Curated annotation (Swiss-Prot):
UniProt lineage: Bacteria, Pseudomonadati, Pseudomonadota, Gammaproteobacteria, Enterobacterales
Keywords: Coiled coil, DNA recombination
Coiled coil feature spans: 25-200
Source organism per UniProt: Escherichia coli (strain K12)
Function: Involved in DNA recombination.
Residue intervals passing through the bilayer: none
Gene: rmuC
Name of the protein in question: DNA recombination protein RmuC
């Protein structure tokens, strides 16, 4: 019995050992499966992290593209507004020019008709008794006036022809404006990546972009704007604004280019939100620092400059400009407090095109003033001409009255010269050629008629008796 108990005990121990071994085997197998699952989860986690990194990269690229799209949409909206405004002005200017041309043509026709009527009245009134010398004198009076009218007509045609050509050129430039701005924006983005970190290169490139905007605006260097002008202030130190734009009425606008690309470049290359936000704050701080430094220069107080109350701070990179203002709109107010206006290539180009239009209208106004002055002088000349022609007409009237009086004494009335001359012929005076018989007969008849109307008197003079006898014989 003891042996059986021992056998059972051994069997029990063997069973326990086998159970323990089996349990250990299952535990080891479960642990191996857990390790495999953990490795699989680590691999999946690594793949997920890689996908998140790629997703962040693509999100940054997408945001960059969205900013570029918004920038281009803003440029397009601004250009469309500028195009509509310029088109409206062109139509108004064309209508105004057409009205002026019609007025000039009507005035010229009226003047020609008045001159023609005046000349016809003068020639008719003189009854074709004006000799060749008087006609030459009249032509000498009319020739300078005709030359002035021709010169006035040529000046008006040249002025409006030049204005039409300028309008055509402006239309052509506006059509290319969108392509130019889009190209400039793309080049600005590309160069932002190429110029990061080199402040000197960035500054030079900013001046190049500013120069291109000035050239595209239609303004002329040396006439409507000047670059790198060195001016000595009251403290004997020299200041050198990047650009000084001249305005009509003797005013100036100062433009200073500022580049801020380092923080802006790090903003787009940041791999996480914290780095991106930090770079954005540095970019805004850089713009704010440029505003303060530019405000301290106080360009408005430089001697010889009749500048406006503000300076234009030019940021050449359009997306950098929009990013700073989008996140910190208060920058505009801060700039205005320092007498500074923030401008980008698009807004500066619109402002410069407006200044170019102001200069063109100023030139047209000066031409109109010259035309008005010449018209005033022409009016004065015409008034003097009419006064002279009136004096000539009065002289002709007086000459005609004198002619009638002389002819009356010659052939009309009692005792006229022709009647007395015919009486001499009746007395036997020898003549070589008789006076016009009709005129002589009329003169004798007039003399006889006046004699019959008057109270008869006894002639005491023998000559008068012979004259009466001659008249009776003539009848």
């Amino acid at each position: 019995m003891d042996f059986s108990i021992m056998v059972y005990a051994v069997i029990a121990l063997v069973g326990v050992a086998i159970g323990w071994l089996f349990a250990s085997y299952q535990h080891a197998q479960q642990k191996a499966e857990q390790l495999a699952e953990r490795e699989e989860m680590v691999a999946e986690l690594s793949a997920a992290k890689q996908q998140i990194t790629q997703s962040e990269h693509w999100r940054a690229e997408c945001e960059l593209l969205n900013n570029e799209v918004r920038s281009l949409q803003s440029i397009n909206t601004s250009l469309e507004a500028d195009l509509r405004e310029v088109t409206t002005r062109m139509e108004a200017a064309q209508q105004h020019a057409d009205d002026k041309i019609r007025q000039m043509i009507n005035s010229e026709q009226r003047l020609s008709e008045q001159f023609e009527n005046l000349a016809n009245r003068i020639f008719e009134h003189s009854n074709r008794r004006v000799d060749e010398q008087n006609r030459q004198s009249l032509n000498s009076l009319l020739s300078p006036l005709r030359e002035q009218l021709d010169g006035f007509r040529r000046q008006v045609q040249d002025s409006f022809g030049k204005e039409a050509q300028e309008r055509h050129t402006l239309t052509h430039e506006i059509r290319n404006l969108q392509q130019l701005n889009a190209q400039m924006a793309q080049e600005a983005i590309n160069l932002t990546r190429a110029l990061k970190g080199d402040n000197k290169t960035q500054g030079n490139w900013g001046e190049v972009v500013l120069t291109r905007v000035l050239e595209a605006s239609g303004l002329r260097e040396g006439y409507e704007y000047e670059t790198q002008v060195s001016i000595e202030n009251d403290a004997r130190s020299r200041m050198q604004p990047d650009v000084i734009v001249r305005l009509p009425q003797g005013k100036d606008v100062v433009i200073d280019a500022k580049m801020t690309l380092v923080a802006y470049e790090r903003y787009f290359n940041a791999e996480d939100d914290y780095t991106r936000e930090s770079a954005l704050q540095e970019h805004i701080a850089s713009v704010r620092n440029h505003i303060r430094l530019l405000g301290r220069k106080d360009y408005q107080q430089l001697p010889g400059l009749r500048t406006l109350d503000y300076v234009l701070m030019f940021i050449p990179v359009e997306p950098a400009f929009l990013l700073a203002l989008d996140r910190q709109p208060e920058l505009i107010t801060e700039a205005l407090k320092n007498n500074i206006m923030l401008v980008s290539p698009t807004t500066l180009l619109v402002a410069l095109r407006t200044i170019a239009n102001l200069w063109r209208y100023e030139h047209q106004s000066r031409n109109a003033q010259q035309i008005a002055d010449r018209a005033s002088k022409l009016y004065d000349k015409m008034r003097l001409f009419i006064d002279d022609m009136s004096a000539i007409g009065q002289s002709l009237d007086k000459a005609q009255d004198n002619y009638r009086q002389a002819m009356k004494k010659l052939s009309s009335g009692r005792g006229n010269v022709l009647a007395q001359a015919e009486a001499f012929r009746g007395l036997g005076v020898e003549i070589k050629r008789e006076i016009n018989p009709d005129l002589a007969e009329q003169a004798v008849s007039q003399d006889e008629e006046y004699r019959l109307r008057s109270v008869p008197e006894q002639p005491n003079d023998e000559a008068y008796q012979r004259d009466d006898e001659y008249n009776q014989q003539s009848r």
